Swiss-Prot record:
Functional description taken from the UniProt entry: DNA ligase that catalyzes the formation of phosphodiester linkages between 5'-phosphoryl and 3'-hydroxyl groups in double-stranded DNA using NAD as a coenzyme and as the energy source for the reaction. It is essential for DNA replication and repair of damaged DNA.
Protein name: DNA ligase
Catalytic residues (positions): 135 (n6-amp-lysine intermediate)
Residues annotated for Zn(2+) binding in this entry: 462, 465, 480, 486
Record's catalysed reaction(s): NAD(+) + (deoxyribonucleotide)n-3'-hydroxyl + 5'-phospho-(deoxyribonucleotide)m = (deoxyribonucleotide)n+m + AMP + beta-nicotinamide D-nucleotide
Amino-acid positions noted as binding NAD(+) in the UniProt annotation, renumbered to this chain: 47-51, 96-97, 133, 156, 192, 313, 337
GO molecular function, one term: DNA ligase (NAD+) activity
Species of provenance: Acidovorax sp. (strain JS42)
EC id: 6.5.1.2
Domain BRCT: from-to ranges: 645-731
SUPFAM superfamilies: BRCT domain, DNA ligase/mRNA capping enzyme, catalytic domain, Nucleic acid-binding proteins, RuvA domain 2-like
Amino acid sequence: MTEQSDLFPAPAPKGSALVATKIKALREQLNRWAHEYYVQDTPSVPDAEYDRAFQQLQALEGAYPDLVTPDSPTQRVLGAVLDGLTPVRHRVPMLSIRTETDTEASGAQAFDARVRRELKLPPDAPPVEYVAEPKFDGLAMSLRYEGGRLVQAATRGDGEVGEDVTHNVRTIRQIPLSLPAGVPPVLEVRGEVYMRRADFDALNERQREKGDKTFVNPRNAAAGAVRQLDSGITAQRPLSFFAYGLGEVTPAAEGGPDFGTHFGMLQQLKEWGFPVAAQVQIAQGASELIAFHQRVGAERDALPYDIDGVVYKVNSLALQRQLGFVTREPRWAVAHKYPAQEMVTRVEGIDVQVGRTGKLTPVARLAPVFVGGVTVTNATLHNLFELRRKKVRVGDQVIVRRAGDVIPEVVGVVPAGAGLAVLAGSDALVDAASSADGTAPAQPLAGPRQPYVPNFRMPRQCPICGSAVVREPGEVNHRCSGGLFCPAQRKQAVLHFAQRRAMDIEGLGEKLVDQLVDGHVIRTLPDLYRLGLSSLAQLDRMAEKSAQNVLDALDKSKRTTLARFLFGLGIRHVGEATAKDLARHFGQLDAIMDAGVEQLLQVNDVGPVVAEAIHTFFAQPHNREVVEQLRACGVTWDESEPAAAATLPLAGMTVVLTGTLPTLGRDAAKDLLESAGAKVAGSVSKKTHYVVAGADAGSKLAKAQELGIPVLDEDGLHALLRGTPPNAGGA
């Protein structure tokens, strides 16, 4: 379903309730953006906007650790497994590395200071020894060798589960298919698949000669090649590989290596036949990290491959183990990026895009400009207030930045008389007094703006459906009020409803939804369950067998859970976690639909804004009609008594999961605990009742022991779920 324009007439809550509401909103927004980026390949915001929201969420959760939940984007590695490739569960998770947002020298100093603080080093202690490496702009890969032979290659995926791409990786000549004698019985090598710039240029030249579509940049070309279902296509793409770490390895006691340092491990990888970047070096303390960052930055354009920063890692593996992890990322490593590349171009127009939630986003239509390996023709302006703050008008010369070297945004207008110019023969921004290298003349930017150019105004009617455009009090975003009546929202509402975490309708992807909505085959969610074989089979690229598969998936999705159904409706501010809380508290959909704001406020983690959103949503007759039609189409779930949640065996308990359990995955353990009424938290505090710890538990286990909180192993968890007093302390 969609959200309505009048969902939030109530004033914002204050104090901790306001913080909880803000955290919940940030999580839901970040999850939507991540789904658009990693699964749909249709990002709606620049990387910089995502990073800002992510950092804001990190800051809030750091200040309010009791509000951290396991399903927060900060507690997991982002990504997704693509359909068509076999899922592979990583035995050792492929964690991401924290990105230092400060691109100056102080970024390296801040990391070094954090490490020294975590290690409790006195000011006069010797410098910490690090390994400094380039940060490759490619696709993370895990190579598993058993008995010295490559048996599996898998992408990062979401960090826990990746994609099996062994058939494609075998075509990469830099990756050895077998290793020399003396390697461990089990060896997982982690690294990056990438494409050299010269190979990328040659590939695009061949594409042009054949009349085929060219690739945007080396990273996209490499990622697309690795994810091919046909390895013959991959073999025609010139891919390369750099190794930079290890996953699962046979323990030293069983014949595995006994490395003392990260640098020593890299040297051993080289001896085993894996390519390691020539720039890798040992650095003593922050000063040498800064020097490395500056040197590699100066060499960046001359390197044969793309990088978007450098990586620092504590060299001592013993210190790495001492520092541990912060669930999502290691404390002993950081990625230190370079300032985003910036160019100058002209604003030729300002268009408006309408998103799934009905948000209207002004987008600058630009004179084409080449920024960071991509020709940019559009850049987001975020919202009307941001546009006015930057004072952007049609005809202006603007600075365009590829935030994170991936997605473009307008930084601001180049003011007249600012002493800036563009380098002749390019759009590179330089000082007007000289050229970039002292040889090419620099042309001053255009003069003052013409006085008759009007300010941009947000349209009063939606450019897609003509419905009224509204802006809620206290919000910066304008929204279309059309809901499901707006085709722009209709498509994304259907995709949201069909996604894996909601109704899980396999095969109902973006291209099929485009045809169904554009062809007026469906107008509302219940129309999905009224589809027939003939209406589907006549669509483009939809043979009878494919159509039947979609119908089977739709039929299968009818049997769901109340939480999934609620999440799938797309009620604003109701994410996956809130939907579960509502289902557990009320037990029945009718009870939720008829609940007043005060009743909704009794639900765990539901504040005034969310309560008002839910109440207003179900107060709309057309929303209730859609729900009733879905039930009439056969969508069903098990319901329980409204008070059942209070009688659950673990009701009121807070449990923290850490480490790797022998047989249960984290999601499975979380589901078991939540179904028993427990709250699964992401951090340990005095309010924690139990900590369930597996292998490599890290700092959470240490904190639990420090606070005297009972620690359970997997057997203890099962005992707790059975209602048997567990034998704490076994982990």
